[in-house]
Swiss-Prot record:
PROSITE patterns: RIBOSOMAL_L6_1 (PS00525). InterPro entries: Ribosomal_uL6-like, Ribosomal_uL6-like_a/b-dom_sf, Ribosomal_uL6_a/b-dom, Ribosomal_uL6_bac-type, Ribosomal_uL6_CS. GO terms for molecular function: rRNA binding; structural constituent of ribosome. SUPFAM superfamilies: Ribosomal protein L6. PANTHER family: 60S/50S RIBOSOMAL PROTEIN L6/L9 (PTHR11655), LARGE RIBOSOMAL SUBUNIT PROTEIN UL6M (PTHR11655:SF14). This is Large ribosomal subunit protein uL6. One of its GO terms (cellular component) is cytosolic large ribosomal subunit. The lineage of its organism: Bacteria, Pseudomonadati, Pseudomonadota, Gammaproteobacteria, Enterobacterales. This protein binds to the 23S rRNA, and is important in its secondary structure. It is located near the subunit interface in the base of the L7/L12 stalk, and near the tRNA binding site of the peptidyltransferase center. Belongs to the universal ribosomal protein uL6 family. The gene is rplF. It comes from Hamiltonella defensa subsp. Acyrthosiphon pisum (strain 5AT).
Length: 177
């Protein structure tokens, strides 16, 4: 049995939960997120507490309940506080700038890279070599950060490229004669 799935989720004040069969919508000050929960999970919402449990005679019910609880908890955190992901650009001439909803990157290619930010993601560039992504959806923020990082991943010899702010790149030793 999943210990994560058994833990109730306390819904803070200012967050509205709508339950429609297996579809849950959570609305807060940062926006609204919707998720479809697996049919092996029973959902109970009373007062300000949301609990999940496995249905009878379903083999993976508690596993699905644990997954759904973790996703719902991150949705509640997202609509109340939001999520941030920081990226740093390391390399000579590597720069980032924001123009409206487009992130313009100069990463050492012969052409600049224009990355269209999806709805629900806000980017900031406090310096030319830092990018901060903000939004309520943790999955979307992480996916956008991974897409930006994939334009120029940190290379193992000098460490140049786009990296997460908390990422440490292990450098290899150069070939010796």
């Amino acid at each position: 049995m999943s210990r994560v799935g058994k833990t109730p989720i306390v819904i803070p004040a200012g967050v509205e939960v709508k339950l429609n069969n297996q579809v849950i919508s959570i609305k807060g000050k940062n926006g609204e997120l919707t998720i479809s929960v697996h049919k092996a999970v029973n959902i109970n919402y009373t007062g300000n507490i949301l609990t999940l449990a496995a249905r009878e005679r379903v083999s993976d019910g508690w596993a699905q309940a644990g997954t759904a609880r973790a996703l719902l908890n991150s949705m509640v955190i997202g609509v109340t506080e939001g999520f941030t992901k920081k990226l740093s650009l390391v390399g000579v001439g590597y720069r980032a700038a924001i123009q409206g909803n487009i992130l313009k990157l100069a990463l050492g290619f012969s052409h600049p890279i224009d990355h269209q930010l999806p709805l629900g993601v806000v980017a900031e560039c406090p310096t030319q070599t830092e990018i901060i992504l903000k939004g309520p959806d943790k999955k979307l923020i992480s996916q956008v950060a991974a897409d930006i990082r994939n334009y120029r991943r940190p290379e193992p010899y000098k460490g140049k490229g786009v990296r997460y702010a908390d990422e440490s790149v292990r450098l290899k030793e150069a070939k010796k004669k």
